[in-house]
Amino acid sequence: MAKRCLANWGRFSLRYGAKPTEPDYIVQNLIQLPATLYASASYIEKYGRMKNVCDIVGHRFISTLKNYENIRFIDWLHKAIPEGQICYRTSDYSSMLAAVTAGMGIAPIERWIDNSRKDLIPLFESPEDWTNNLWLTTHRDAHNTPKIQAFTQFLKEELSNINLR
């Protein structure tokens, strides 16, 4: 039973960043997710507040272990921030959030976080080129099945309720 269930769910995926290009999949843009740099109040008190993406001197940053060139703000982080200003690297999103919350440094985070994390402060408006898309991919053979259509409709309705500013 579990094997069959997994096979059925394997006919769709959520992808973040660049548009998927696999030929056997139908790709739908679910939502655009703007991002900006965030810091905690304790970080701002100690190091000051960045004014824009060029104002990096004297600031500490939280980064990912590897670059994800398909995610614009992660790519910026890896290309624009000198190694000596990276104070912590992580491979997962929850560790990045915890490090920013603890005041260790600044990190790029999607704006939807504003809805649930009042302890994180957006430093400025989202740079236009930092908006990434969330894509739903469904295998062409399963795209029109009732299960996939119901899930797609549910997902689109839920995502339309997110306040992204």
Language model regions located:
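Acidic, Gly/Pro-rich loop/turn segments at junctions of secondary structure
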Residues: 1-89
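Alpha-helix boundary recognition
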Residues: 31, 54-57, 100-101, 115, ...
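Hydrophobic hinge/microswitch elements
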Residues: 80-122, 144, 152, 160
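A late-sequence structural motif
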Residues: 126-165
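Residues at the C-termini of beta-strands that transition into short coil/loop
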Residues: 16-17, 65, 124-127, 140
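Short beta-strand->loop
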Residues: 27-30, 110-111, 119-131
